[in-house]
Amino acid sequence: MVGRQKRYEVLLTQGAERDLESIYDYIAEVDGKANANDMLDRLMEAVEGLARFPERGSCPKELVALGIKEYRQTQFKPYRLICRLMARQVVIYLIVDGRRDMQSLLANRLLG
């Protein structure tokens, strides 16, 4: 029998919560509430998946270029979830469309 895997607590910053609201509002306006609900459900599954696999994904290349390696990203195309592991917690700072200017978004949210 395989040992039970420890779960991490996943926390969303206020900025990440606002990101989810913005994504929902945009999709609801452009593509309908049903599609917005579906996308929100799938994004939340990705968020909750970090409780079991907090180290999945990679370091954002925009931050690595600045010598910052303590953040990780999980991609849920086209969205990127940017988080940081701290003790037994995964703190999600940013949930955005990866086609946006990530350098500016990361600088404003994480370094600003």
Label each region the model flagged.
Residues 58-88:
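Basic/aromatic recognition patch in beta-strand/loop cores that engages polyanionic ligands
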